[in-house]
Every structure is written in structure tokens, then in C-alpha cells.
Amino acid sequence: MTDPHTPIADRVAELQRESASRLPADVRAAFDADLARATATGIPADVTAAGTAMPDGDVVDEGGHPTTLASVRAGRPAVVVFYRGAWCPYCNLTLRAYQETLVSELDVRGVALVAVSPQKPDGSLSMQQKNDLTYTVVSDPGNQIAGRLGILTATGKQARDAQMSLGLDLADINADGTHTLPFPTVVIVDAAGTIRWIDVHLDYTTRSEPAEILTAIDAVLANHHF
């Protein structure tokens, strides 16, 4: 069993050791090439900066009920986590790590934790159930919120073909029937709905560490007097 305090980077290293012997070499090569392509361009120039308003938008909760991101926050400061989907092993280990290390820390600070992906609501429910998540998991159909943040990307054809060989079709999983995904991103929003910290990861095998998020949250809480 993984120690709850194990950094995400260490969990990823273990996952990659396990998958190296499980995935066919051509599939690994396709994924590696697509990752290199995605990271080569750098952070998109239009990523929303700290100090601007957090985009709101219609989302669907894990039960299939329509709501909005602002309603989910309910006037609280929040850590909003954009992830790729329940099909992504890196997303699973990350959201599980956040459950183990962040939930109680954020609760005592009065901060909400919300995970957002473009997948259909049943994918959100699957993510929540298989990782025993107690925080809110919602679908952002069509990547409306992620798009306004400027954090969108799309898998290339070679990677899509590799995914299909594994029985994975993003067009069937995503609510809008496309292959568009958010870069893994954590956004800290204050109670007024202003972005105070944003951490975008072009490399989907890396994620914002819980310790980094807590440090950023404490700085925001100290400076903005929620």
C-alpha cells in the first residue's frame, strides 16, 4: 500500500516501472512521441494569469445533474483540479493522492476541492468511486471552462491510434465527442472568484504536488483574508 505522504513524482515513477513491461513497445513509442510534441511548444501564451476572474460555466456532477462551477464552490475559496479523465492512470494516482493528503488539510482551512474533466458524467462517477474520493468531481462538457483558461491540447493521430489499439477512444469518452483534453492544471481561486495561483503541466506524467498546493493556499489565505 502506498504511503499517503509519498510524493506524486515517486508514485508516477512506480507506475512507469510497472507499465514499461505491460505496454507494447510501439504503443510506448507513440505515447512518448506525442508527449514530446505537446511539451515542445511551451506553456500556451493565452493561459489565464493569476489576478483575473476564474471563468464560470455549466458543469455536470457525477450524478448527471447540471450545475455551475460557481455553485460547486458555494462562495468558498477552492482548489480546482483539471484532469484528463478516469482512463488516465496518472490522473487516478493524482486524485487519489489529493484525497489522501489534501482533503483534510483543505477542510480545516474552509477550502473546497473540485476535480474537473471533459469526460461524460459516468466517467466522473467512475473516477470518484474507484478512488474513494469524497470531494466533488464534475464534467466540463466541451471543455468550456478549460478552454477559457487557455489550457487545451489534443492528442495526435499516432497517439490516438495507439489508444485505439488498447481499446480507448477519447471521442467516445469525452462528453463532446472530440479528442480535446486539458493540460493537467491546478487553479487556486479565492472566495471572490479570482485566480490567485495557476500551475499548468504540459507533461501529463507530472502533476502539482500536494505540498506545493498547500504552500500556495496558505500564502493566498494569508494575503487575501478570506
PLM regions and their residue ranges:
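A glycine/proline-hinged amphipathic helix-loop "lid/cap" segment
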Residues: M1-D46
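N-terminal "domain-start" segment that seeds a small globular fold
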Residues: A33-A70
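Short active-site neighborhood of thiol/selenol oxidoreductases, capturing the structured segment around
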Residues: L69-Y98
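A short, polar/charged loop-to-alpha-helix boundary motif
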Residues: Y204-N223
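Structural microenvironment flanking redox-active thiols in thiol-disulfide oxidoreductases
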Residues: L95-R148
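Short, positively charged
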Residues: D32-A38, R160-D169, A222-F226
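Thiol/selenol-based redox catalytic cores and closely related redox-interacting motifs
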Residues: D140-T206
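Generic recognition of short, well-ordered alpha-helical segments
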Residues: L93, S126, S208-A211
